[in-house]
Amino acid sequence: MVAKIIDGKTIAQQVRNEVAGLVQQRLAAGKRAPGLAVVLVGENPASQIYVSSKRRACEEVGFLSRSYDLPASTSEAQLLELITQLNDDAEIDGILVQLPLPAGIDNTKVLEHISPAKDVDGFHPYNVGRLCQRAPTLRPCTPRGIVTLLERYQIDTFGLNAVVVGASNIVGRPMSMELLLAGCTTTVTHRFTKNLRQHIENADLLVVAVGKPGFIPGDWIKPGAIVIDVGINRLESGKVVGDVDFDLASTRASWITPVPGGVGPMTVATLIQNTLQACENNDNGVSA
């Protein structure tokens, strides 16, 4: 068996094109373009790359894009004050604070200070709670992007045994909620899980998000399984690989996401979708 490739790059471009078309319709109807504020504190090289890709994506679809590049010496109080101003700014529909933040700034306090109605990353407890209660509004970007990939490829998930490897607030936990909504029987594994191999060998749908290159051996994959690899790891050679041994896994799975070009592009595309949704919610008087 040779797995079919789930091409996130192509689907992400489709999503961007769809959003760009909807923005043009808004402008033609006399409405304003959605606005996204991207806040970067410090000079983390990886964060700078991520932020530049998000800003570029915004501009490509016709959003108002505002950048706030703050020095590493910025205090927590100063950052919270900026977020307060952006919460009150009628031109801004989405606020994105790039993580990680410098030492001395409480990530949780900062993320919870963002208005849930402008939380386009989907990290605010209100939005995570809505997802848990089967009434999602702004959904965490990577899990929602994965669901979009499964939907676009018409992969039926109802009744599947799904296993999520990794229990982070950004991917693992909200992903488990998305899979429940998608009709899966869902297991979340983590660093205290015993018999990890046994769980994976029983998985019809496997989502791996641990940030360790080749963490899941390919021969653990159940024949015919759907494999979603969220990991993005750069080796010393410069090669970028995922958390799953792709070469062997792709001979056993029915569908698999490559790294790069799988889940990664969908995270930014979903951020764009969420920003448009936040703008439309604002138009319609829908508040968090």
UniProtKB/Swiss-Prot annotation:
- Catalytic activity, reaction form: (6R)-5,10-methylene-5,6,7,8-tetrahydrofolate + NADP(+) = (6R)-5,10-methenyltetrahydrofolate + NADPH; (6R)-5,10-methenyltetrahydrofolate + H2O = (6R)-10-formyltetrahydrofolate + H(+)
PROSITE patterns per record: THF_DHG_CYH_1, THF_DHG_CYH_2
Pathway(s) the chain acts in = One-carbon metabolism; tetrahydrofolate interconversion
The UniProt GO MF terms for this protein read: methenyltetrahydrofolate cyclohydrolase activity; methylenetetrahydrofolate dehydrogenase (NADP+) activity
Spell out the disulfide connections: none
Which CDD domains does the record match to this protein? Answer: NAD_bind_m-THF_DH_Cyclohyd
Entry EC number(s): 1.5.1.5, 3.5.4.9
Alphabetically list the UniProt keywords: Amino-acid biosynthesis, Histidine biosynthesis, Hydrolase, Methionine biosynthesis, Multifunctional enzyme, NADP, One-carbon metabolism, Oxidoreductase, Purine biosynthesis
Quaternary structure and partners:
Homodimer.
Name the chain's protein: Bifunctional protein FolD
Native organism:
Erwinia tasmaniensis (strain DSM 17950 / CFBP 7177 / CIP 109463 / NCPPB 4357 / Et1/99)
